Amino acid sequence: MVLNTPIGRGGLVATMNYSDFQLDDNATIQSLKILINQCWKTLPIFEGKDKENKIVYSREEAYENYQKHLCFLITKVSGASKIWQDNQYYVELVYMLVGMQDFKEDEHDRVKYIVHHCTKLVINMIDVILNNES
């Protein structure tokens, strides 16, 4: 798959051939570690907390931010589908993140449980790489 992306306002276009795109194991592991951190951020976002762990958003604002963050995670994870399409942990992670969009504002315990589960799935993906499994 070839993607042409406009760069700036001058009409320049960057072309990337995704069929040739590959990360080495170290880069993939680092990317997955970042994903773990982004999954963990979901819970304080849902709770309306800032970086200092203080509640600064109303329940409604926090829920809106939670939905935006989930959209970001789903976009990021689904973008890696060519790399991970045969990995059971990846497939389950996508299902979980998409399913979390249906959670309501008052389902804190459910969000907390699934965030923990999602991070475990990503850790399992790292283990697959470290153990050279397919």
Task: Please give the residue ranges for each predicted region.
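Residues within HEAT/ARM-like alpha-solenoid scaffolds
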Residues: 27-30, 34, 88-91, 113
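Alpha-helix capping and helix-coil boundary motifs
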Residues: 28, 55-56, 62-65, 73, ...
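Amphipathic alpha-helical interaction modules
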Residues: 38-95
